Structure formats: structure tokens, C-alpha cells
Design a protein with these regions (language model features):
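N-terminal small-domain helix-loop-helix segment of the aminotransferase-like
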Residues: 2-95, 102, 283, 391-392
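Conserved core of the PLP fold type I
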Residues: 59-189, 206-207, 211-222, 229
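Hydrophobic residues in well-ordered beta-strands that form the structural core
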Residues: 116, 137, 199-200, 353-355
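Helix C-cap/helix->beta junction micro-motif
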Residues: 131, 193-194, 224, 349
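Conserved core segment of the aminotransferase class I/II
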Residues: 222-299, 303, 307, 389-390
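Conserved glycine-rich beta-strand-loop-beta hairpin in the small C-terminal domain of fold type I
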Residues: 281, 297-306, 318-331, 363
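PLP-dependent enzyme catalytic core of the Aspartate aminotransferase-like
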Residues: 344-353, 359-392
């Protein structure tokens, strides 16, 4: 089936955070390219599966054949990444952020430090803080124009006895790096040296550019598996964030028991949402054709955006993202004041973006743009930014 990613779909009135949770003072007619979900209609097999479930008309307590659900998840891992995962090591959560919060509670105590790599997805720092832990920053650095891990600083952070572990973003949001096997192995060796854990948020794992390979962290360190947790979900991949289902891969039997004690017994989240399971099963068994077309479309959007920026915003700096559908645009040469830049984007350009400073001070002067939308909307957004910064 051929899917039409150029179709513009009105999402008003659908409880869409992207279109209804807008900043105060958002002008009429502003374009919304901030929240990381897609403006593409879901794969037809997913829609049909949900229709069939809804048509039944009864939505009582659900009991799943967990082996069937988990088999579908690990089958996807094997097919897309040649990653062998045992079903017994897969656990469910309404989302990766709730899972990270639970894991922080299980693996650390109040006052412990947890390493992150800014500029990075801001809920990492938020969940560390709300759980009364301490953020230990090891910022990414630029080498020959590319973002890379600062292994010297990472070693210092891991060596510090106050720091007990790390949250990794892989692929990295917002900078778009897809870490190579060598980069990941080097990171694991440092963690292993100091016997520290790593929580790897891999929610964007399916969304990489053509020719780029994502490596699940657990795949390359079986000997250290008890100290690594990998978090995945169908939500970014298949535009299912509202379905609230994520898959958490935990190897350590002791941590598995603690997880069940907290998430199942204490919080009562024993089973995933009925619609979430229905959507995920359809996605992982029948959604690949849709996904391949969407990835190809996003790749072309990225190319079009890069070409436009190079020609029309010569003082901007932008790396071609290896993964995600997020563009990390450095506009600091046009406006060095991050709050003023944010105001220009909202009030003058009339585009709602994720302002770089929310990802940490390393993001000052940047804007994060979601390109998972019809190309006409993306190009309109870039044209508005250009007009606001350099004139028509």
C-alpha cells in the first residue's frame, strides 16, 4: 500500500498536545513543529486492528497471553536489529519516562548522582531531580563539527563515588547522533571499570537515516547485561505515543523482582493498556511497510531542510541527523540571547518549536524542529524562520 505523507491532517479537537498545549501568546496561524510525534496518519493495519477492537464494544479488564505479546516484541528486535532477547527479560510500562523514574528509585538512593549528556532530553534531569537525586552533567563535545561523547569527563563522573549510574540517550535527542558500536563499547568499558549501571533510552531506535545502523546497548555487552537496562517503545516509530505502552529490557533477576514489586505490586500497573497492546501487536507484525515509507519520507525532509538552511541561512549551523526526526538548528549567530531567540520564533516567525535552552545551557541559541510532517509545512516553517531572521 502506498501512504501519502504529503497529506495535511487537521489535528485540532483531538486532544493533541502538539496543537492544543501551546505557549501563552501563541499567535493565530502559528505552525506547530515541537512535540516529538508525527503528523502522519498511522499504518492502516494498526487503524483496522483498533477499529476491530472498538467494534466489539466491551472494554473490561484485560488479560493477555504475555508470551504472545512478548514474542511479538522480541521478534521485532530480532528482525530489525538482529538482537536476541529472551521473553522473560521484557517488561511493560506506560512510557519510558515513568520507567526511568521507577528505575532511578530502584537503583539509587536520595542524594546519589546520575550522569547525563546535555544537551539532552530534558525529562532526564527532571526525573532525577523529582526523585531527589543529583544531576551529574557530562556534556557532549564537538570534534570536527560532530557531537561526540567526552570520555575524559565521563570517566571523571563514573569515578566519582557519589555518582551511581548514567542515563544514555541512544539515538540522541536532540542532536541526532546514532552512537557507533565502538563509541558504545568504550562507554561500557568505563562503566564496567567503576561498576556503575546504564539506563539506555532507545525510543528512537527505529528512526535512523538510510545506511545508518542503530546498535542496542545490550547487544554489545552481554557480559555486563545485569548492569544495563534498555528502554524501547513503538510510540515514536509508529506514532503511537497516546497509546502509552513501552517495553523495558531488564536482565538482572534481582532488579526484575524489584521492578515487579514496585511497578506491579505497589503502583498496580500489572498490565498494559488494552488499546496499546492492540496497536503494538499490529505495528510490529504488519506495520513495516508503512514504517519504511515514512522513514524514506523523513530522510527526504531532512535533505530538503539541510539544503534550504545552507542556501538561505548561511550563518546557521546544522548537522545532518543520523537518527530521530528532529532537526537541531544552531541559530546563535543570528541571536545569541536564547530567550530573545525563542520570542522571535514564536512572535515574529510564528512557529512553535522546542527552544534549545530547555535541553540545558549547551542548547542556548538552538531550536529543535520536528520534521515528521508534510514537506510543505516544514518548508513553510523554514521560510518563516528565514524571514524573521534575515528578511524576505
Amino acid at each position: 500500500m502506498k501512504y501519502n505523507c504529503d497529506e495535511s491532517i487537521d489535528r485540532q479537537g483531538t486532544q493533541s498536545a502538539k496543537y492544543q498545549m501551546l505557549p501563552d501568546g501563541t499567535p493565530e496561524g502559528a505552525l506547530s513543529l515541537w512535540v516529538a510525534d508525527m503528523d502522519f496518519r498511522c499504518a492502516e493495519p494498526i487503524i483496522k486492528a483498533l477499529h476491530d477492537r472498538v467494534e466489539h464494544g466491551i472494554f473490561g479488564y484485560s488479560l493477555y497471553k504475555l508470551s504472545e505479546v512478548k514474542s511479538t516484541v522480541v521478534g521485532w528486535y530480532k528482525k530489525r536489529f538482529d538482537w536476541d532477547v529472551e521473553e522473560k527479560n521484557v517488561f511493560f510500562s506506560p512510557g519510558i519516562i515513568p520507567a526511568l523514574s521507577a528505575l532511578i528509585q530502584l537503583l539509587s538512593k536520595e542524594g546519589d548522582g546520575i550522569i547525563i549528556q546535555p544537551p539532552v532530553y530534558f525529562p532526564f534531569a527532571g526525573k532525577i531531580g523529582v526523585n531527589r537525586r543529583v544531576v551529574a552533567n557530562s556534556p557532549l563535545i564537538r570534534v570536527d563539527g560532530d557531537y561526540v561523547m567526552d570520555y575524559e569527563t565521563l570517566e571523571e563522573k563514573f569515578a566519582d563515588p557519589k555518582n551511581v549510574g548514567m542515563i544514555l540517550c541512544s539515538p540522541h535527542n536532540p542532536v541526532g547522533r546514532v552512537w557507533s558500536e565502538d563509541e558504545l563499547r568504550r562507554l561500557v568499558e568505563i562503566a564496567k571499570k567503576y561498576d556503575k549501571w546504564i539506563l539506555s533510552d532507545e525510543i528512537h531506535f527505529d528512526l535512523v537515516r538510510k545506511g545508518v545502523k542503530h546498535t542496542p546497548l545490550l547487544k554489545i555487552c552481554p557480559e555486563y547485561a545485569d548492569k544495563v537496562v534498555v528502554c524501547t517503545a513503538p510510540s515514536k516509530t509508529f506514532n503511537l505515543a497516546g497509546m502509552q505502552i513501552s517495553n523495558i529490557v531488564i536482565h538482572d533477576p534481582e532488579l526484575q523482582e524489584k521492578w515487579l514489586g514496585l511497578v506491579d505490586d505497589c503502583w498496580g500497573m500489572m498490565m498494559p493498556n488494552a488499546m496499546g497492546v492492540t496497536a503494538m501487536m499490529a505495528a510490529y507484525t504488519q506495520g513495516e511497510e508503512w514504517l519504511d515509507q515514512v522513514i524514506a519520507y523523513i530522510d527526504e525532509n531532512m535533505k530538503a531542510a539541510c539544503a534550504y538552511v545552507k542556501e538561505n541561512l548561511p550563518k546557521a549551523r546544522m548537522d545532518y541527523p543520523e537518527g530521530t526526526y528532529l532537526l537541531w538548528l544552531d541559530l546563535s549567530e543570528y541571536c545569541g540571547d536564547p530567550e530573545k531567540l525563542a520570542e522571535i520564533m514564536l512572535k515574529k516567525a510564528k512557529v512553535v518549536l522546542d527552544d534549545g535552552y530547555i535541553f540545558g545551557p549547551e542548547g542556548n541559541g538552538f531550536e529543535r524542529i520536528n520534521v515528521a510532517c508534510p514537506r510543505s509545512i516544514l518548508m513553510d516553517c523554514l521560510e518563516r524562520i528565514k524571514t524573521a531572521l534575515v528578511g524576505a
